């Protein structure tokens, strides 16, 4: 009996788990780590932690009522000790003050976000964005979202934003509760936009009064269940917004063309689909990573703060310069939006011919901006105060005419609002000298020079550098003191000291230079810049032509179905700006072309037959643009399609044709008529030198053949 008990006794150094481990084969065909029973893996641990944080953010106390899987939280701590704990953001010592200009600037830089304070003075815990920003589907193409203070929602797509409670910031513009909804365009052709929750002062109300106010503000938009959900999960000092699917004639018009419809669609399919993605998809938007949004550097934030402060006290002239695709237009939009937060309007002088902001390309324009800019240039086409059609995308070999046009447009500036001047991205060789001429002619108070690590070296445009550098048509300070030289008289004319002091030539008074390091991300490079710029110019033309569409209740009609205006030959003069065309071929150049509708001083009443041809390029006001869709030689009339009203069209007496062409998608998309499409043909001779079967952009990958390195013979 004693022997049997001894036989069943286990050795003290061997356990059942050790015997099982010894009995397993030593050859393992999988590299996956061995898992102990009762311990979660990293993926399960991360999923459990996300669920606990989500439950805590939605108001549930998971410590008191343990959810499913919480019994292994203690064991999870043993696995989490091997990884370093995440650093908590610094807690400010004082509660946030009401939003100011500097606070608005910091929202554009994700590195400057601070932890907001709750009503009890304790910091609000910041977790992943998809946890602290609850989203609820309201139906009928509407979504409700709540943003804690200091957090942002970066998205792609187009939508209409309404601030129901709190304050929001988009592209530098502050949207307060009670303001009209704003249309926001966050398309993938540019950096994505971010809707930020702006910290505001804690209201002197009780919790019950705040909940009652939120319910009253949400009543016109939501149902009772939705209001209860908002009150239950409302973050302290948060903001409530409603996102709606956008319906406008501009959007519907762009969707009818293949060359522009893809701009409004999502770029690619998502990797993972969740409930938030399904909810936001109903209104046509999607959450994006914060790193894809607009981010300003510290120097950019300081420059914006200084410019906003000086613009509130006066009307400074601000000139922006920099290389191509460095972020001048983006900086201009942010500056304009921030200025509109405190002043009623901002004047804008467009000197960039290739990439205009508010007009079709090829124009020098002056206009007053009174509404925020919440999208790319082709989404906010405006009517200028004065505009001249230059007709080309650059001013190579025609600098004098370009400077004369800029001075002609600049004379209409009344100094009622701050003026922002946008310049071209040509800052090398003659482009730099032309920029020096513009600084002397326009005499800005501030020059904002954007630079980047990827751009070539550009001299710093200080006031001393501009004074000592010769332009194309203006001289440096040293040469100006030697006397004046007029091209018409050469060196045979001399002036006295009094005549020099009273000379109408521009006198440079100096400026303050603000150097801004650009951190904007751009998808353009030397190979695809021409392709991108052409697409943006076509979108600007389509944005202007969308004004031809009737209001929303009416059906959308193609352009070729609209009734054009009939303009007699004897009523307007014609001029081709970018080339010398024989008089016998002038009507071929005008037909099916993009024309500027201008007004010149000369009277056209003495001409009876026509067409009337101008001998030189005029500097005159351009009232708008149109398409010459046909010429009737029997009735001797032009058929013009334009959104200009008839009362303005009566004052037009000149048609200017430039190098800006009509987008090809307009000719290709002509539904309805059967047979051959007008102005589109496939009958051409490929044997002509220079002809090719492939129509489109040059393939740069095959443009530069790679030669193999051959070893030399010994």
From Swiss-Prot:
InterPro entries: Clp1/Grc3, CLP1_P, P-loop_NTPase
Phosphoserine found at: 128, 502
Organism: Mus musculus
Root EC class: transferase
Keyword Ubl conjugation: yes
Segments of skewed composition (Pro residues): 86-98
EC number in record: 2.7.1.78
Ribosomal protein is among the record's keywords: no
UniProt region (Interaction with LAS1L), positions on chain: 495-714
Gene Ontology terms, MF aspect: ATP binding; ATP-dependent polydeoxyribonucleotide 5'-hydroxyl-kinase activity; ATP-dependent polyribonucleotide 5'-hydroxyl-kinase activity; RNA binding
GO-annotated biological processes: maturation of 5.8S rRNA
The entry's keywords: Acetylation, ATP-binding, Isopeptide bond, Kinase, Nucleotide-binding, Nucleus, Phosphoprotein, RNA-binding, rRNA processing, Transferase, Ubl conjugation
Family: Belongs to the Clp1 family. NOL9/GRC3 subfamily.
Placement of covalent cross-link Glycyl lysine isopeptide (Lys-Gly) (interchain with G-Cter in SUMO2): 500
Record's signal peptide: none
Localization: Nucleus, Nucleolus; Nucleus
Protein name, UniProt field: Polynucleotide 5'-hydroxyl-kinase NOL9
Modified residues (N-acetylalanine): 2
Organism classification: Eukaryota, Metazoa, Chordata, Craniata, Vertebrata
Location, primary (coarse class): nucleus
Catalytic reaction annotation: a 5'-end dephospho-2'-deoxyribonucleoside-DNA + ATP = a 5'-end 5'-phospho-2'-deoxyribonucleoside-DNA + ADP + H(+); a 5'-end dephospho-ribonucleoside-RNA + ATP = a 5'-end 5'-phospho-ribonucleoside-RNA + ADP + H(+)
């Amino acid at each position: 009996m004693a022997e049997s008990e001894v036989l069943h006794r286990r050795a003290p150094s061997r356990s059942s788990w050790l015997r099982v481990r010894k009995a397993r084969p030593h050859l393992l065909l999988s590299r996956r780590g061995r898992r102990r029973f009762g311990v979660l893996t990293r993926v399960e641990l991360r999923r459990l932690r996300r669920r606990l944080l989500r439950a805590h953010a939605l108001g549930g106390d998971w410590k008191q009522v343990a959810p499913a899987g919480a019994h292994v939280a203690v064991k999870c701590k043993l696995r989490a000790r091997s990884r370093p704990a995440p650093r908590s953001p610094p807690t400010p010592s004082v509660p946030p003050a009401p939003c100011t200009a500097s606070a608005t600037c910091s929202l554009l830089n994700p590195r400057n976000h601070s932890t907001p304070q709750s009503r009890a003075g304790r910091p609000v815990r910041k977790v992943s964005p998809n946890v602290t920003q609850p989203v609820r589907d309201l139906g009928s193409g509407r979504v409700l979202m709540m943003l804690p203070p200091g957090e942002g929602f970066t998205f792609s797509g187009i939508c209409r934003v309404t601030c129901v409670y709190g304050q929001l910031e988009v592209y530098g513009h502050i949207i307060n509760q009670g303001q009209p909804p704003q249309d926001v365009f966050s398309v993938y052709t540019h950096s994505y936009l971010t809707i930020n929750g702006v910290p505001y002062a804690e209201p002197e109300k009780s919790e019950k009064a705040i909940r009652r106010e939120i319910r009253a503000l949400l009543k016109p938009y939501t149902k009772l269940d939705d209001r209860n959900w908002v009150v239950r999960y409302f973050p302290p000092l948060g903001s409530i917004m409603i996102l709606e699917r956008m319906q406008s004639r501009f959007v519907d018009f762009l969707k009818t063309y293949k060359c522009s419809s893809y701009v409004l669609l999502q770029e690619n399919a998502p990797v993972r689909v969740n409930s938030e993605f399904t909810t936001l998809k109903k209104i046509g938007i999607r959450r994006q990573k914060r790193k894809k949004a607009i981010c300003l550097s510290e120097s950019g934030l300081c420059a914006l703060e200084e410019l906003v402060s000086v613009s509130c006290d006066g009307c400074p002239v601000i000139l922006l310069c920099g290389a191509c695709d460095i972020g001048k237009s983006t900086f201009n939009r942010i500056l304009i939006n921030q200025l509109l937060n405190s002043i009623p309007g901002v004047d804008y002088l467009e000197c960039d011919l290739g990439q205009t902001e508010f007009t079709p390309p090829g124009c020098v324009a002056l206009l007053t901006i009174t509404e925020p800019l919440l999208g790319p240039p082709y989404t906010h086409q405006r009517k200028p105060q004065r505009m001249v059609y230059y007709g080309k995308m650059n001013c190579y070999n025609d600098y004098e005419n370009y400077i004369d046009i800029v001075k002609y447009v600049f004379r209409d500036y009344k100094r009622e609002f701050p003026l922002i001047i946008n310049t071209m991205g040509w800052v090398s060789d003659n482009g730099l000298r032309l920029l020096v001429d513009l600084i002397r002619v326009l005499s800005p108070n501030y020059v904002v020079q954007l630079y980047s690590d990827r751009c070539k070296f550009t001299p710093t445009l200080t006031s001393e550098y501009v004074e000592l550098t010769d332009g194309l048509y203006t001289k440096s300070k040293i040469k100006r003191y030697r006397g004046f030289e007029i091209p018409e008289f050469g060196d045979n004319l001399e002036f006295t000291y009094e005549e020099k002091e009273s000379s109408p030539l521009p006198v440079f008074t100096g400026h303050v230079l603000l150097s801004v390091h650009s951190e904007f991300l751009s998808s353009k490079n030397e190979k695809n810049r021409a392709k991108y710029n052409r697409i943006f110019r076509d979108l600007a033309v389509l944005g202007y032509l969308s004004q031809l569409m009737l209001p929303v209740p009416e059906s959308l009609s193609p352009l070729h179905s609209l009734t054009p205006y009939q303009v007699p030959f004897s009523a307007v003069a014609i001029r081709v700006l970018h080339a010398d065309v024989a008089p016998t071929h002038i009507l071929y150049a005008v037909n099916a072309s993009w024309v500027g509708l201008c007004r010149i001083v000369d009277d056209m009443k003495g001409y009876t037959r026509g067409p009337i041809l101008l001998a030189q390029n005029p500097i005159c006001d351009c009232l708008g643009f149109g398409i010459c869709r046909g010429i009737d030689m029997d009735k001797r009339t032009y058929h013009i399609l334009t959104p200009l009203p008839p009362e303005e069209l009566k004052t037009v007496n000149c048609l200017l044709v430039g190098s800006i062409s009509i987008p090809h998608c307009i000719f290709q998309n002509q539904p309805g008529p059967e047979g051959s499409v007008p102005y589109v043909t496939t009958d051409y001779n490929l044997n002509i030198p220079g002809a090719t079967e492939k129509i489109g952009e040059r393939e740069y990958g095959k443009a530069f053949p790679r030669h193999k390195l051959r070893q030399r013979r010994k």
